[in-house]
Amino acid sequence: MTTRIDIRFAQLKREGRPAFVTFVMAGDPDLATSLQLLKALPTAGADIIEIGMPFTDPMADGPAIQAAGLRALHGGTTLHKTLELVGDFRKDDATTPVVLMGYYNPIYIYGVDAFLADAKAAGVDGLIIVDLPPEEDAELCLPAMKAGLNFIRLATPTTDEKRLPAVLANTSGFVYYVSITGITGSASADSVAVGDAVARIKRHTDLPVCVGFGIRTPEGARAIAAQADGAVVGSALIDALQKTLDTDNRATQATVGAVADLVASLAAGVRGAQQAAE
């Protein structure tokens, strides 16, 4: 199968530049603002969009993304409404890849077959499910692949040579390398260590490797993108959004623009990695 993710990475390879991947939480702080933000991301420079599925117990997420998920849940965002959000985004954008990221529990409750059918129909291209290891591939990974969705696996600094082949076995779309040990937003990525890790992963796979966790500035994005096939930014965008909210955590006129401006500056940093390599 060829997905929008595959097409986008092939395009980026022809252009000789890394991908800029943005993460936002579905329904944060409300569904209408969330849709406006999604529509603004590609124009600002996002090559791939990851959309968080709000969940009550997000164990891998730091304070910023946890708070975003709670705002979304309090605003009434459900997994069904998250898929509707993707469908609404697709009415105006048929090309930007969309990856849903989150935890297995809401999908299990929704029903795997129903979720995969509805996700595919909405225009979802891939899934990142952080609490499903390769040993559980039969639960969701293999059915997702059969449904035509990429299943993107996480590799970490603690994923050793013995474990890596299992992690990569049924991965498609790209590999998401978590550059730090710990929760999101908790530290800065070390570009030298990242370069070594990406090289190690690439000895085992031809898939693109994108690096996330710990990227907050254009300079940081540029340094990481120079070592990988893409850079992922989430917590910094969530922080920028949160700073524009009113005292009741409602969106203001500044909300979408503030995030889009940061995306544009980070995207320029990622594109600077291409120029530095030339």
Swiss-Prot record:
Which key words are in the record?
Amino-acid biosynthesis, Aromatic amino acid biosynthesis, Lyase, Tryptophan biosynthesis
> From the Swiss-Prot or TrEMBL record, what is one GO molecular function term?
tryptophan synthase activity
- Active-site positions on this chain: E50 (proton acceptor), D61 (proton acceptor)
Instruction: Quote the pathway field.
Output: Amino-acid biosynthesis; L-tryptophan biosynthesis; L-tryptophan from chorismate: step 5/5
Gene3D superfamilies (alphabetical): Aldolase class I
Q: Which PROSITE patterns match?
A: TRP_SYNTHASE_ALPHA
Its UniProt entry gives the catalysed reaction(s) as: (1S,2R)-1-C-(indol-3-yl)glycerol 3-phosphate + L-serine = D-glyceraldehyde 3-phosphate + L-tryptophan + H2O
> What is known about what this protein does?
The alpha subunit is responsible for the aldol cleavage of indoleglycerol phosphate to indole and glyceraldehyde 3-phosphate.
Q: Which family is it part of?
A: Belongs to the TrpA family.
Q: Entry's HAMAP family? A: Trp_synth_alpha
- Name of the protein in question: Tryptophan synthase alpha chain
